[in-house]
């Protein structure tokens, strides 16, 4: 049986993304985990979604193409080199496409030491609004904070020369 709480959690990313996507868009659920519910939500709404997860769907060849959207929910905090990985994924995003991220953001340096999110030993990379603004600038992306932990990066609609 599906966890309704998890469905609501992922809908905070899926619902606004679905409003942005063209019909029958092609996407990648990067780091989808063992039960790719977000991919299923997107597919039920007419989109094609490929899966990649280092442990559960390790077919890395699947992410050697371009996509209209890439989602990474509760993934970037687990990456040892998130800048490298996000840049690589960004190159696979078509012009006008969206990269949708979900991760808890650092509120302030003062609160970091007591933040519950750092207690998970698999969380090794942390982001703040400032970090994401920097990343967006580096990528040439339009940044949108959709919710407290839902971030969209939109690629410009033209290929660079």
Where do the model's predicted regions map?
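A short SAM/SAH-binding and catalytic strip from SAM-dependent methyltransferases
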Residues: 69-82
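Active-site micro-motifs of SAM-dependent methyltransferase domains
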Residues: 56, 77, 106
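Conserved N-terminal segment of class I S-adenosyl-L-methionine
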Residues: 1-69, 86-87, 119-120, 130, ...
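Histidine-centered active-site/metal-ligand motif
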Residues: 47, 78, 123
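Short secondary-structure junctions
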Residues: 140-144
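A short, conserved alpha-helix within the catalytic core of class I
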Residues: 79-92, 103
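Short, glycine-/aromatic-enriched active-site segment of Class I SAM-dependent methyltransferases
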Residues: 104-125, 130-131, 135-137
């Amino acid at each position: 049986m599906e966890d309704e709480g998890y469905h609501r959690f992922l809908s905070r990313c899926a619902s606004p993304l679905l409003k942005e996507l063209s019909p029958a868009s092609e996407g990648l659920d990067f780091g989808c985990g063992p039960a790719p519910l977000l991919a299923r939500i997107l597919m039920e709404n007419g989109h094609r979604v490929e899966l990649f997860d280092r442990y559960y769907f390790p077919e890395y060849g699947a992410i050697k193409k371009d996509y209209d959207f890439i989602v990474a929910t509760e993934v970037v905090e687990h990456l040892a080199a998130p800048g490298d990985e996000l840049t690589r994924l960004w190159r696979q995003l078509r012009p006008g496409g969206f990269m949708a991220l979900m991760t808890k953001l650092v509120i302030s340096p003062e609160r970091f030491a007591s933040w519950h999110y750092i207690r998970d030993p698999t969380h090794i990379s942390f982001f703040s609004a400032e970090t994401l603004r920097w990343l967006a600038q580096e990528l040439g992306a339009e940044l949108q904070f959709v919710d407290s932990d839902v971030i969209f990066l939109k690629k410009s609609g033209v290929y660079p020369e």
